[in-house]
Design a protein with these regions (language model features):
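Helix-to-loop junctions at the C-terminal end of transmembrane segments
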Residues: 56-67, 262-276, 360
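C-terminal membrane-cytosol helix-exit motif in multi-pass small-molecule transporters
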Residues: 170-188, 382-386
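Short amphipathic helix-loop junctions that connect adjacent transmembrane helices
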Residues: 25-39, 231-247
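Cytoplasmic helix-loop-helix junction between adjacent transmembrane helices
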Residues: 98-137
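C-terminal transmembrane helical hairpin of 12-TM major facilitator-type secondary transporters
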Residues: 262, 277-321
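Helix-loop-helix hairpin linking two adjacent transmembrane segments in secondary transporters
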Residues: 132-180
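Conserved MFS/SLC helix-loop-helix module at the cytosolic interface between two early adjacent transmembrane helices
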Residues: 53-92
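Juxtamembrane intracellular "pre-TM" segments in multi-pass secondary transporters
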Residues: 1-3, 183-217
Length: 391
């Protein structure tokens, strides 16, 4: 029964993130159509992660108290509403409203990871979390391409309503899948136990659980550099090599493919041989090597190699570290733990885009990637500290 639950969860995660990914590349063009300055555009992206950062621990606690299914359904409903607001936006304030609502309602990822943890034995948890990570990667991989096709190539006549409606319909479809195919994974007994226990906030949880604190810090460092890469790569590629959107899109598609392959299959093969701690460490080293390679790349081939290393590194680190984090939870507070852990990544996605531009302008085109490599390396120490203090 437990293995049967992972298939529908995978499908729900793909469809959910696909709807989100469809609209990601369209927001800059929508903001430009409304005359938004670059700083305002950055803020539109950052406000989503900021709201997600605030809300994720709350969603995690609610999923422990009321179950995973209600949180998934509520989050998908909020996402559907935010897509409609975005598609029919009449100004920049509408864009902000959409992203704020979407960020506050983004409890889906933490709930999906908690669900996968619920239905997986400890020895298979990394593989199950990797499967959810792969589903998220597929959504991010296919979404932007589909969004571009739906909107059209001519920016003067591009339709933003069509992609938004498709995204909203995907959310409704995902709600139906959760309702009819996903049984509740958080048992009534666990929920009753959670209701009678003292509530622990995210900061207190990090203080009381050193291993979780170290893992969350490692995730923050890695995700920060990932956000730097994603936010500045197109500008770097244009100015250094003259790469257009098609080439950049192909390169980022390849990065996402490798990350998905690692999370969906590579982790399943490597964790039994290496363990989560060693695989997470190798993931950090590979990601750092990829960032350095991109920074010094003299041509398209080396750039592709660097991005390939980044994809493999991130795809190795994320499910391994998530599995280690889930092991710091008791059965009654797994959602809270995963929500707290995911908040560190949300914080990194707030900070990364805001600093990549100034670093690029002040220190040169390759500097953001080199700074990212230096920031990421200490994650190895935090991983090993987490292993030493793990439950």
């Amino acid at each position: 029964m437990r293995n049967k639950q992972l298939g529908p969860l995978f499908l729900v995660s793909v469809i959910d993130i696909l709807g989100f990914g469809i609209l990601i590349p369209l927001v800059p063009y929508m903001a430009d159509r409304f005359g938004a300055a670059p700083a305002v555009l950055t803020a539109i992206f950052g406000v989503y992660s900021l709201c997600q950062l605030i809300a994720a621990p709350l969603w995690g606690r609610l999923s422990d108290r009321f179950g995973r299914r209600p949180i998934l359904i509520s989050s998908l409903t909020g996402a559907c509403a935010s897509y409609i607001i975005l598609g029919f936006a009449q100004g920049v304030d509408w864009l902000f409203a959409s992203r704020i609502l979407g960020g506050f309602m983004a409890g889906n990822i933490a709930a999906a990871f908690a669900y996968a943890s619920d239905v997986s034995p400890p020895e298979k948890r990394a593989a199950s979390l990797g499967m959810v990570g792969a589903a998220i990667g597929i959504g991010f991989m296919l979404g932007p391409a589909i969004g571009g096709l739906l909107a059209g190539n001519d920016l003067r006549t591009a339709s933003f309503v069509r992609p938004a409606v498709v995204s909203a319909c995907l959310s409704l479809f995902a709600i139906a899948l959760v309702t009819f195919l996903l049984p509740e994974s958080n048992t009534a007994e666990r929920r009753r136990e959670h209701a009678t226990r003292e509530r622990v906030g995210p900061l207190r949880m990090l203080v009381e659980r050193p291993a979780l604190r170290f893992l969350a810090t490692a995730a923050l460092l890695v995700t920060f550099s990932q956000a730097v890469l994603e936010s500045i790569f197109a500008l770097w590629a244009l100015n250094k090599f003259g790469f257009g959107p098609r080439t950049v899109g192909l390169l980022m598609f390849c990065l996402a493919c490798l990350a998905v392959l690692m999370q969906g299959g590579g982790v399943r093969l490597l964790v039994p041989r290496l363990g989560e701690g060693k695989l997470a460490t190798l993931g950090v080293l590979t990601f750092v090597a990829g960032l350095v390679t991109v920074a010094v790349a003299p041509n398209l081939v080396m750039t592709g190699l660097g991005l390939a290393l980044c994809g493999i590194g991130v795809g190795s680190f994320n499910p391994s570290a998530s599995s280690l984090a889930s092991k710091q939870a008791d059965v009654h507070d797994r959602g809270s733990v995963m929500g707290t852990y995911q908040s560190s990544s949300s914080l990194a996605r707030v900070i990364g885009p805001f600093v990549s531009g100034p670093i690029y302008a002040a220190l040169g085109p390759g500097a953001p990637f080199l700074v990212g490599a230096c920031v990421t390396l200490p994650a190895i120490w935090f991983i090993w500290r987490a292993r030493a203090r793990s439950r």
